[in-house]
Amino acid sequence: TQSTGTSQTVEVGLWGGPDN
């Protein structure tokens, strides 16, 4: 999925989360 954060490494649920 497309990440809303800066990095697209980690996805949370149905949305892409930032690589924290």
Swiss-Prot record:
Belongs to the jacalin lectin family. GO terms for molecular function: D-mannose binding; IgA binding. Residues 1-10 have a biased composition (Polar residues). Residues 1-20 are annotated as: Disordered. Keywords: IgA-binding protein, Lectin, Mannose-binding. This is Agglutinin beta-2 chain isoform 2. Tetramer of four alpha chains associated with two or four beta chains. Two isoforms exist, a major form and a minor form. This is the minor form. It comes from the Eukaryota. Alpha-methyl-D-mannoside and D-mannose specific lectin. Binds IgA. Signal peptide: none annotated.
